[in-house]
């Protein structure tokens, strides 16, 4: 029996399953090249966040987790559940590929950008985050980077949790994972989150609609998974999750219906996966199919989401993946096929008729070590039903010139396909071409006197950016962006203290006008201090968010406005009352700084949370 249970665990930690690992140098990651490898062999800059990290930071949202990571800048139109944007290394929010268990998140069909404020943190057991182009591995969207959210649990057990906080915040949840018999594992989880929120419109600098009320958020989440080991080599699994979100925001009146105030968003999302894995000492393969369906309503709550004045963004997404990897020499070769179909239902507000977009991608990856030199490459061809074939490639080389020190050079191409709204919406243009990018990067990394560090410089040229033509009243390819940046990270211990440092310099500009791209801070400093003192686990976070620019849409013509820099401190502490019960407390924005990440939208100010978890 012990042998069988160990076998099930080993089969679960495959190149494609995403079972959580420790975040140290021996951590195994799967996102960089779609096969399992130690994180210290990945040539692209990579960050791993575990569930233990999330609990230590006491984050309440996925956005709160991501903002701590290198190369990340975020903007949000208020508090929990409000519209958010994720910028990686200065690229657009639509230039980051969001995966859930290796499958593209079905949330960006019409709008083109995934809003991580709507994804439940309760589902997140691990995040693997890759910076730089990855279209040669994954296809569209992976211009700035890839974020892979992994939902599978690391170990068996049952956890019950509850929390309260500022703005009437409440959270209640539970999960259990059990091994049945010798070779079957079952996981069930549920979560409920609610906050009354605060008025998201900032005072004194927004000419829009004044709506002095609280803008709250509520989420309900369910998750289930079943995994079975048929033999030493074959494993099958099925999993599903769904969530319902309701968000109140400061809305708008429509000129055609001046008595209707649209200020509520209701999102329903469900996803189902099923797969079969094969593993032996040299060869690994997985066949995975997935179906997801999302309905995103915006409406006047007095009239309901089915009223004619409501809007609906409804997308169905179908995915089939066949991924393979074989160990060769001192490395690995991977190859596979992706097929995806996105469908809009007739009646979707932004796309009146029903449309389908199909994409088939074939890719090849390779990683090989030759003495002190490591080479990595990937090539991919996508066949899209709208714009035809598109090819991408990338290559990297690392030279360990002194033991423990290496230089890495990389180049890659990437692209972003036009979304359904840009193609078929009210102002759509079905002749749009994909947005394209070329990125160069050079980096040094090493271990010096106990300090694990990395310094890199990069340039990203993005062409064919899609913009809106006011004269023609349609989308067209016109824009160009030139992004240059420097990124530095370091981690080290001093006695009982663990330090993590990050510095980002990003110069992201419109190549035609030389204007800075909005909502990107030119400089950021991030610092994390963790320690244990008398059984209390302490976590101190510092974040300097530099000056940014945004657009004031309340003026005509619109004007650029400057958002000042800010220094933010968070402090969190936890205490294990028993071996099963842990209590936690956190103060976010310790010094109650007043700042904005999106012009005209307030942030929460100082917030308190108190929570506890019981594990058995």
UniProtKB/Swiss-Prot annotation:
| Domain TBDR beta-barrel positions | 155-616
UniProt KW Transmembrane keyword: yes
Task: Kindly list the residue ranges recorded as spanning the membrane.
Answer: 158-165, 169-178, 184-195, 217-227, 232-248, 265-279, 281-298, 311-327, 330-339, 355-371, 373-383, 387-402, 405-419, 436-445, 451-460, 475-492, 496-511, 519-531, 537-552, 560-574, 587-598, 604-616
Family assignment from sequence similarity: Belongs to the TonB-dependent receptor family. BtuB (TC 1.B.14.3.1) subfamily.
Domain TBDR plug intervals: 38-152
| Protein name in UniProt | Vitamin B12 transporter BtuB
A Gene Ontology biological process noted in the UniProt record is:
monoatomic ion transport
Provide this UniProt record's keywords sorted from A to Z: Calcium, Cell outer membrane, Ion transport, Membrane, Metal-binding, Porin, Signal, TonB box, Transmembrane, Transmembrane beta strand, Transport
Broad class of the protein's primary localization: membrane
GO cellular component, alphabetical, reads:
cell outer membrane; pore complex
Motif location (TonB box)?
Answer: 26-33
Q: Place the motif TonB C-terminal box on the sequence.
A: 599-616
Q: Does the keyword Membrane apply?
A: yes
Q: So where does cyanocob(III)alamin get bound?
A: 83, 85, 92, 110-111, 311, 519
Binding-site residues, Ca(2+) 1: 199, 211, 213, 215, 250
């Amino acid at each position: 029996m012990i042998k069988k249970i160990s076998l099930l665990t080993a089969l679960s930690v495959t190149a494609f399953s995403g079972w959580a690992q420790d975040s140290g140098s021996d951590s195994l990651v799967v996102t960089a090249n779609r096969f399992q490898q130690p994180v210290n062999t990945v040539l692209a800059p990579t960050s791993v966040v575990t569930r233990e990290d999330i609990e230590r930071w006491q984050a309440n949202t996925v956005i709160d987790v991501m903002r701590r990571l290198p190369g990340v800048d975020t903007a949000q139109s208020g508090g929990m559940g409000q519209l958010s944007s994720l910028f990686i290394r200065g690229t657009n929010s639509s230039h980051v590929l969001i995966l859930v268990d290796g499958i593209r998140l079905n949330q960006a069909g019409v709008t083109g950008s995934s809003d991580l404020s709507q994804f439940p943190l309760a589902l997140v057991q691990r995040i693997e985050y890759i910076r730089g182009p990855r279209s040669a591995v994954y296809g569209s969207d992976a211009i700035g980077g890839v974020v892979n959210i992994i939902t599978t649990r690391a170990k068996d057990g049952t956890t019950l949790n509850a929390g309260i906080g500022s703005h009437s915040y409440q959270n209640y949840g539970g999960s259990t994972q059990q091994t049945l018999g010798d070779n079957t594992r079952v996981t069930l989880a549920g979560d409920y989150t609610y906050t009354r929120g605060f008025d998201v419109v900032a005072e004194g600098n927004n000419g829009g609609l004044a709506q002095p009320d609280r803008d709250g958020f509520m989420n309900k989440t369910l998750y289930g998974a079943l995994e079975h080991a048929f033999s030493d080599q074959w494993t099958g699994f099925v999993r599903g999750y769904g969530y319902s979100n309701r968000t109140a925001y400061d809305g708008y009146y429509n000129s055609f219906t001046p008595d209707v105030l649209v200020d509520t968003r209701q999102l329903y999302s469900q996803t189902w996966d099923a797969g079969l894995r094969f593993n032996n000492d040299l060869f690994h393969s997985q066949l995975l199919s997935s179906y997801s369906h999302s309905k995103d309503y915006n409406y006047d709550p007095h009239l309901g989401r089915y009223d004619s004045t409501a809007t609906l963004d409804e997308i169905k997404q179908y995915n089939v993946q066949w991924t393979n990897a074989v160990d060769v020499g001192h490395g690995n070769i991977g190859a596979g096929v992706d097929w995806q179909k996105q469908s809009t239902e007739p009646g979707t507000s932004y796309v009146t008729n029903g449309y389908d977009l199909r994409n088939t991608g074939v890719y090849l990856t390779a990683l090989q070590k030759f003495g002190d030199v490591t080479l990595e490459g990937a090539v991919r061809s996508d066949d899209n039903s709208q714009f035809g074939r598109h090819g991408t490639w990338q290559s990297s080389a690392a030279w360990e010139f002194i033991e423990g020190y290496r230089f890495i050079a990389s180049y890659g191409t990437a692209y972003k396909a036009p979304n359904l709204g840009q193609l078929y919406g009210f102002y759509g243009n079905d002749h749009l071409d994909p947005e394209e990018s070329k990125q160069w990067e050079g980096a040094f990394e090493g271990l010096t006197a106990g300090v694990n560090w990395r310094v890199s410089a990069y340039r990203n040229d993005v062409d064919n950016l899609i913009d809106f033509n006011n004269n023609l009243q349609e989308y067209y390819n016109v824009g160009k962006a030139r992004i240059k940046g420097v990124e530095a990270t370091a981690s080290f211990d001093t006695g009982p203290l663990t330090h993590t440092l990050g510095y980002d310099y990003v110069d992201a500009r419109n190549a035609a006008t030389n204007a800075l791209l909005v909502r990107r801070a030119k400089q950021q400093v991030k610092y994390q201090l963790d320690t244990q003192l008398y059984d209390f686990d302490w976590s101190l976070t510092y974040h300097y968010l530099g000056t940014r620019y945004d657009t004031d849409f309340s003026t005509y013509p619109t004007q650029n406005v400057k958002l000042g820099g800010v220094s933010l401190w968070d402090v969190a502490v936890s205490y294990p009352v028993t071996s099963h019960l842990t209590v936690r407390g956190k103060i976010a924005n310790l010094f109650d700084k007043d700042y904005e990440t999106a012009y005209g939208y307030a942030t929460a100010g100082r917030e308190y949370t108190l929570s506890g978890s019981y594990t058995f």
